[in-house]
């Protein structure tokens, strides 16, 4: 029932016939590499693709950070709305006005913080950020 040490020692109790087949997954042949020029072009394309991916995380990280900060503002507004609705002392319009006022206040504070942090960005960081924006 086994062939070259592969397979069952005995098919008894295995609910199979014990037949051993060749594995179609094993492929030891190498792909043809092509000419030197084709190999060089492939390597250059791989390097370029990996370089592009390596430069993205800065911009993506900045977008994620901005999104999370805006989300935090909305969470605070939502918590205020829930608290005011539970009290049931204000009308829906008054609750909306208070929520909009809080959202505007928090957004202005966040924008001011963004402006201040951009003023004190090191020159090298500003240059790399500008390069990523123009690409």
UniProtKB/Swiss-Prot annotation:
Q: Which InterPro entries match?
A: CWC21, mRNA_splic_Cwf21_dom
Can you quote a single GO CC term?
Prp19 complex
Q: Kindly give the Gene3D superfamilies that the UniProt entry links to this protein.
A: 6.10.140.420
What does the UniProt entry say about where the protein is found? Cytoplasm; Nucleus
Q: Where is each CWF21 domain found? A: 65-109
Keyword Nucleus in record: yes
Q: Where is this region: Interaction with PRP8?
A: 53-97
Q: Which residues form a coiled coil?
A: 65-102
For biological process, the GO terms are:
mRNA splicing, via spliceosome
Keyword flag Transport = no
Question: What segments bear the compositional bias annotation Low complexity?
Answer: 33-43
Chain residue ranges for the region called Disordered: 1-67, 110-135
Q: Biased-composition ranges for Polar residues?
A: 12-27, 110-120
Say which domain of life the source belongs to.
Eukaryota
According to the UniProt entry, which residue ranges have a biased composition of type Basic and acidic residues? 126-135
Q: Which UniProt keywords apply?
A: Coiled coil, Cytoplasm, mRNA processing, mRNA splicing, Nucleus, Spliceosome
Explain the purpose of this protein. Involved in pre-mRNA splicing. May function at or prior to the first catalytic step of splicing at the catalytic center of the spliceosome, together with ISY1. May do so by stabilizing the catalytic center or the position of the RNA substrate.
Quaternary structure, from the entry: Associates with the NTC complex (or PRP19-associated complex), composed of at least CEF1, CLF1, ISY1, NTC20, SNT309, SYF1, SYF2, and PRP19.
Q: What else is known?
A: Present with 556 molecules/cell in log phase SD medium.
Concerning its family, UniProt says:
Belongs to the CWC21 family.
Please state what the protein is called. Answer: Pre-mRNA-splicing factor CWC21
- Organism of this sequence: Saccharomyces cerevisiae (strain ATCC 204508 / S288c)
Classification from the root reads: Eukaryota, Fungi, Dikarya, Ascomycota, Saccharomycotina
């Amino acid at each position: 029932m086994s062939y070259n040490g592969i397979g069952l020692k005995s098919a008894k109790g295995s609910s199979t016939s014990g037949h051993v087949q060749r594995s179609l997954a094993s492929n030891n042949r190498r792909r043809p590499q092509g000419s030197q020029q084709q190999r060089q072009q492939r390597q250059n394309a791989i390097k370029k693709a990996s370089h592009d991916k390596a430069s993205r995380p800065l911009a993506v990280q900045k977008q994620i950070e901005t999104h999370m900060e805006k989300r935090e503002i909305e969470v605070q507004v939502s918590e205020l709305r829930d608290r005011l609705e539970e009290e049931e002392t204000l009308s829906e319009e008054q609750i909306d006005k208070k929520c909009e006022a809080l959202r505007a206040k928090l957004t202005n504070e966040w924008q001011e913080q963004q402006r201040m942090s951009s003023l004190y960005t090191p020159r090298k960081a500003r240059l790399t950020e500008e390069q990523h924006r123009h690409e």
